[in-house]
Amino acid sequence: MAALCEAFTLCGLGPAGGVGLGSGLLALEPGADPDHVLLTDRGRTTTLFKVSDQKPLGCWSVKHGQIITCPVVCNFETHEYIAVHDNKVLRIWKDEDVNLDKVFKATLSAEVYRIHSLPHAEPLVLFKGGGVRTLDVLLEAPQQEIENVISDEVIKWSEAFLESRQPVLIFVTEKDGDFFVYVQKPKMRSLHKYKLEQQELCNPLSFTAYIKKQIITLLCLYSSDSVYKVLIPLQQSSEEEEQTSSKSLLLNLSISGSVLKGTSFVVLDKDHVAVLGSLAASGEESKECLTIWNTKFQTLQASKELPLGTSGQLWCYGEKFFFTHGKVLTVVIYKCETSSLAAAVGKLKDSQTSDLSSFVNWNTLGDEELLVSLQSQQSVALKSESKMTLRSKKSAVANIQPDTSTVGQFLLSIKDASTAAVEDQLRQLLSKAQMPDFQATIGCIISALINRCKTDPKFYPRNFLVQMIQKGELSYSLCPDLMAVALEKKDVHLLQICLQRFPDIPEEITYACLKVFLSISDDYLERTDVNLESVISYIDIEPNNKEVKTEVVENGFNTELEEDGCDVTGMKETHMMDSVEFCPVGPQKAALLNAVLHSAYSETFLLPHLKDLPAQQAVLFLRYLHYLYVKCSEKINTTLPGILSPTISQIMDWMCLLLDAHFTVMVMLPEAKGLLSSMHRFVRAQVRLYSELNKIEGSLQELQRIKCQKHSQAYSIEVLELI
């Protein structure tokens, strides 16, 4: 038996990764770790993802004007990544590499169709002319001549396997409506060609294959809504140039009058295949869906509708399906069990439900589905208890049941209730002493509230949302639409708390928060509830008070001094000028910007978004960062007072990011030139300061070393005067 289990979103897709054939991704390949996948888009970027965390680990792009023409793969032996751009240019790099322009490059003599990576073997490079080379042989002479095996044929599909520790490559070509299968063993220099038996009025759409006992089983998905099987033996005694291979019907994709128009499929085991396509019944509109079929019993065993549409691509790694759904890449966990008549009728002995980690995407469920999901999770939790439950534990479990029904009633009642009524019910609900799986329950409730907020603009239980975030029970992945709604309503206080509490906010959302904070006027923010704990201890709130002095210890040089001069009086005067330099933004906006500085990010993913920041906002943000840097430098320990105040490392990192994104624009802006010049002088003075401190430290260490030297063959008489 087979079943589709939990589904979750791995990542969003760009404009080219949408719905429809010809769109989507270039490919999805496994990474060095079983939990890693390599995503290559139809442009110039590839991204490494950790599936269980739903977070990117690295992203690499070729230059503008170049395009990746071959899916990026991982060399399982060296843990290096291999890509081909512009058909002939080979690139090889490692995790720590950032700029692909600086990694290994080789220009080949022929165009590459695909690179296949195999465990415990060198990757195989398949050229568009049908020639094959192992990567090590190819790198010895990148410009070596590649033979043209196929004439006027176009490769449609390819796959590589290891059989008896020998690599085997199989690829399918097409010419004038005829399809051919090539089986090649690169190390044995053997190549066999087969012609697929033609099928009237239909053509193969997709291929997949596997090897077992020296026999290749090639499965072909035809436009006649059928899957055919072709058996090709690896051991061939015949030396014929071309042989015709017969096929046999494996599966008809029809059930109860409905026909599945498949676009792609994968083999799960010897009895199961998964097919992605459109299920159409007579007189009804077709629906795209993911299905699992049992080839042994010719039955449909699992199906999942995909209302947002797909690109027709399907991948399967580690008991997980990967496919595009709308504008996101979706992951669906599945399970397959041994096919038998006993299992089909539920009479298989010792059958147990496998333990699967729960991945619930609360955002995609409606209120009724949320309730069913919540109840199913709680029932699983209760069933997992030992069968030898004590009476006391049974009574405790019994006490939990009313809470479940209470949560369910609440989810069904919030559709029409007012904000005040909903918040009152929530306070009563959360006051319960016991609540099973508290975090999942809260995630379910938050998602239901957000769904109501989307449909009813007047409904917004802000107080409850703030309370739940402050308790630390939520994360961005648990309620991904929460911050989107807060951004739409410009609820800066809620966004501030999310930035401080959520550890997994995507860089796109962090940038959106920064842009909103910079665009809102200080006058508006003065009427807004914002937590000022991160700024109240150091910011200059009274701009008219010119006598404000901060408790600092001077550690900076006069920025106006010459390189070889040092005037203490000038230093003090300059320091007095710096100490009364006022913050370029109000305290409320400063507190919000501090929350952005505290959020976790990856420079690779944040920098493209920062480049879209308007120039005036970028200058204002840079002025504030400069102000913070000056304030930090005034302190002997270079730390700002207050709770959740930004560190000097965070300030410097953001300054570098902002300058990387906008340096050319800022150099051209008149209002930014003075700021850049001031920053340059200040940083130069700091560098000179630390240079002098390093010299002093070196001198002290040398004095300490001389003082500690012992002369074993000498003696001295010391006279000590006691006072």
UniProtKB/Swiss-Prot annotation:
Keyword rRNA processing: yes
One GO term describing the cellular component: nucleolus
Pfam family, one: Nol11_C
InterPro entries noted in UniProt: NOL11, Nol11_C, NOL11_N
Keywords associated with the record: Activator, Nucleus, Ribosome biogenesis, rRNA processing, Transcription, Transcription regulation
Protein purpose: Ribosome biogenesis factor. May be required for both optimal rDNA transcription and pre-rRNA processing.
Name this polypeptide is given: Nucleolar protein 11
Native source organism of the sequence: Gallus gallus
